[in-house]
Design a protein with these regions (language model features):
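Catalytic metal-binding/acid-base residues of hydrolase active sites
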Residues: 2-4, 39-42
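Surface-exposed cleft-lining segments at the edges of enzyme active sites
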Residues: 1-11
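Metal-dependent phosphoester-hydrolase catalytic domains
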Residues: 9-34, 40-122
Length: 122
């Protein structure tokens, strides 16, 4: 997911569609539903608050993800739809280096990693 980076009004419209469509399609899902990406929204922004009406942020918000060479802003996230399905977060972090090398050279955003334990099949 990539939200608009220039207009708060456009972000509001995008979030309204995401929340509505995902709730309609996955409210009765038996598995967790995730949303991840460059949301171009700071942790205390209206955009993230609007997303949190339907989603729970699972990745850290206290460190930067952008720009990758000097990450000062957290604008990249992984969220879980609040549809009654739970999963355990086993770990979540921003990656600065990984096996392929320096993350700052791969993108202008640092990757976020989420490790989960899925609920047992019933």
């Amino acid at each position: 997911t990539h939200l608009d980076h220039t207009s708060a009004a456009a972000q509001r419209d995008q979030v309204a569609v995401i929340n509505r469509v995902m709730r309609e399609r996955y409210a009765e899902a038996s598995k967790p539903v995730f949303l991840g990406g460059d949301l171009n929204a700071l942790p205390d922004s209206g955009t993230l608050r609007a997303l949190q009406e339907a989603w729970t942020v699972l990745t850290p918000t206290d460190g930067g993800t952008y720009p990758s060479h000097d990450p000062k802003k957290c604008i990249d996230y992984i969220l879980q739809l609040d549809n009654g399905v739970t999963c355990e977060t086993a770990g979540a972090r921003v990656l600065h280096r990984f096996e392929a090398g320096d993350a700052a050279r791969a993108s202008d955003h640092l990757p976020v990693l989420l490790e989960i334990r899925l609920p047992a099949e019933s």
